[in-house]
Each structure stands twice: as structure tokens, then as C-alpha cells.
């Protein structure tokens, strides 16, 4: 049974990465920035799996598990910081928080 072609998998990973990067650069809401970082991490994880399947090794799947666990830790810490920032400043806009500090 053949999977998807190598080039198609990398194209999907590149599209996901570019969407995450656009969200990271365009959005000013901290929640959307955190979601964009998650999309970036998932794109790199997909690239690891595709590269591992190309060479017939399970290293890509092992790296996928590592990236997913890292993303879970990053999400929990990021959401805790997000809740703290919202309680303190009553906004999630990154620009307005920068202006408050002077």
C-alpha cells in the first residue's frame, strides 16, 4: 500500500507552515498568536513524518510524538500566561499591553 507522494506531503507541510507564519505575523490577539504557533509546530511534525516515511524509518514518527508533547506543554504554559495577562490588563491585544508599560 502506497501513501501519499513525498512531494505532496511536503507541500501540505509548507502550506501549513506558511499559514501559521502569516497568522503569527498578522494577528495581534495573543490567543490567535498561540494558535498560529501550534499550527507551525504541527507543520514541522508533518514534515518529520513525511521525511521518515520517505526513508522507511520510524524516526519521523518518534519526532512527531516529541513535537506533539512539546506543543502540549507550550499550549498549557501559553494559556496560563494568557489568562494572567487577561486578568491583569483586561485585553489580549499585544500592542495595547506594550503601550501600557510605556
UniProtKB/Swiss-Prot annotation:
Cellular location(s): Cell inner membrane
Chief place where the protein resides: membrane
TM spans (from-to): 6-26, 30-50, 62-82
Record-linked Pfam families: Oxidored_q2
Membrane topology: Multi-pass membrane protein
Gene3D superfamilies per the UniProt record, alphabetical: 1.10.287.3510
Gene Ontology annotations of biological process type: ATP synthesis coupled electron transport
Enzyme class: translocase
One cellular component (GO) term of this entry: plasma membrane
UniProt similarity note: Belongs to the complex I subunit 4L family.
HAMAP family named among the record's database cross-references: NDH1_NuoK
Official protein name in the record: NADH-quinone oxidoreductase subunit K
Gene: nuoK
